[in-house]
Amino acid sequence: MKKIGIISLIVIIIDRILKVLVTNNFVLNVRNKIIDGFFYITNCHNEGAAFSLFSGNVLFLIFITLIVLFLIYRTINKENVNKIGIFAYGLLLGGILGNLYDRIFYGYVIDYLDFRIFNFNFAIFNLADAAIVIGAILLIVFEGSDNDGRKNKDRSRKLRKEWKNR
């Protein structure tokens, strides 16, 4: 649990630093070219969740976030989390808490990473969002794996046996 907390804290600190830098150095809603046609910094405020879903419902989003945090906490405490899981949960919690901070103190999330791929304008997001997505993907892909990322066959067999013996 301690390692998960350290990873989360690192994500939160880097996320806060980047959001403060963007807020202090980039005009709101102005696209700033970093790599022409591909990567821009665009300081914008997202009052909703991903893709501005539930926009304007800050209290609802805070409430849902607190429920998700509680569920993750319970999951971490119930399961034996491997190295990949520690990293994944650290990213996930750091990202969730980074965006929760914004919602509580500003009423919106500060987004700034703006990518265009083949003239397709992808959603503007932030480091916390990226941490959430990467953490979730790692948990999905490596669920039930041992420390090296290999499927833990013994654990699977044991769980199947327990289920059959009910």
What are these regions (language model features)?
Residues M1-R166:
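Alpha-helical transmembrane bundles and membrane-interface segments of multipass inner-membrane proteins
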